[in-house]
Regions:
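Start-of-domain marker
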Residues: 15-82
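Residues that define the transmembrane beta-barrel architecture of outer-membrane proteins
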Residues: 17-19, 49-53, 99-103, 134-140, ...
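Membrane-embedded beta-strands of outer-membrane beta-barrel proteins
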Residues: 23, 53-55, 105-107, 140-144, ...
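Residue-level signature of outer-membrane beta-barrel architecture
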Residues: 27, 59-61, 76-78, 109-111, ...
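Repeated loop/turn-to-beta-strand initiation elements of outer-membrane beta-barrel proteins
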Residues: 31-37, 62-68, 82-85, 114-119, ...
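Transmembrane beta-strands of outer-membrane beta-barrel pores
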Residues: 39-45, 89-95, 111, 125-129, ...
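Outer-membrane beta-barrel "beta-signal"
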Residues: 58-64, 107, 208-225
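Detector for outer-membrane/organellar transmembrane beta-barrel domains
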Residues: 110, 118-163
Length: 225
C-alpha cells in the first residue's frame, strides 16, 4: 500500500526515464568497522551525468536485539546498528567539465517501528571541490522498509524520501522520492532495484527527472561467523 501511495503521488507528466547503475563492495574489518568501495553513475541531487568512485569507512555500535531480529534476512548488517558513522571520499569524473573531489560525512540512525517495519534516518554532508571552488550540500534520507517472505525466500521492499540543501543555490533545491525492493541472493550478494523521481528547483525552470536504478551490493567479512 505504501508503494502505491508513493507512486500515485508522483507528478503525472512523464519525463525521459534514465538508468542508474551502481556497484558497492563491503568488507567488515571487525564487529565495529566496515569499509566499502562504491562505483556508480551519480546524478544525485540533480547533478548532470557523472561517474563517481571512492571508498568509505563506517563505524557502528553493537546491534540492537530488536533490529537484529528484524534484519535477519538482510545481508547489510549496518541496518541492525542503532548508530552508524561514515566518512568517505569520491572522485567525480564529469564529461566536458573539470573533475570534482568530494568528502562525505554521514550519521545514520536505525530504529524498529510498528508492524515489523524498519526506519533509517541518514544525515549526510557532501563537501565538494571543483576547479578551485568549494560548495557543499546537506541531504537527509528517510527510509521505511519491511521484509516479506515468499515461501522460503525473503525480499525487502522500501520507500524513501531525500531532500537536498545546496549551498550554490542557498535553498532546499531537490527532493528525491524512491520506491524499490532489495533482493538477497545467497550469503554475499544483494540486488537493489528502484524507481526514483527527482524534483529539481535549483535552476529555472524546474527540472523533474525520473530514473530506474539497479545496484549490486557485495558483502564480505574478515571475521569468521
Amino acid at each position: 500500500m505504501g508503494l502505491l501511495l508513493l507512486l500515485t503521488a508522483l507528478p503525472a507528466r512523464a519525463q525521459n526515464l534514465q538508468f542508474e547503475p551502481e556497484v558497492d563492495a563491503h568488507l567488515n574489518l571487525n564487529s565495529t568497522f566496515r569499509t566499502y568501495l562504491q562505483a556508480k553513475d551519480d546524478r544525485d541531487g540533480g547533478d548532470s551525468t557523472q561517474f563517481a568512485i571512492g571508498q568509505s569507512l563506517e563505524l557502528y555500535l553493537k546491534p540492537l536485539l530488536k533490529l537484529k531480529k528484524l534484519k535477519t534476512h538482510d545481508l547489510d548488517d549496518s541496518k541492525s546498528r542503532f548508530l552508524v558513522l561514515e566518512v568517505g571520499y569520491r572522485y567525480l569524473d564529469i564529461p566536458d567539465s573539470p573533475s570534482e573531489n568530494r568528502m562525505i560525512t554521514a550519521v545514520t540512525l536505525n530504529l524498529p517501528v510498528v508492524a515489523g517495519f524498519h526506519a533509517s534516518d541518514r544525515n549526510r554532508a557532501d563537501l565538494d571541490w571543483k576547479a578551485g571552488k568549494f560548495t557543499y550540500r546537506y541531504r537527509n534520507r528517510l527510509t521505511f522498509e519491511r521484509t516479506f517472505a515468499i515461501h522460503s525466500y525473503h525480499l525487502i521492499p522500501y520507500i524513501a524520501a531525500e531532500p537536498y540543501y545546496e549551498s550554490q543555490y542557498s535553498k532546499w533545491s531537490t527532493t528525491s522520492l524512491f520506491a524499490g525492493c532489495i533482493f538477497p541472493v545467497g550469503k554475499h550478494v544483494e540486488f537493489n532495484t528502484y524507481y526514483q523521481h527527482d524534483n529539481n528547483t535549483g535552476k529555472h525552470p524546474n527540472m523533474p527527472e525520473q530514473y530506474v536504478g539497479l545496484a549490486l551490493y557485495l558483502f564480505f567479512s574478515l571475521e569468521k561467523k
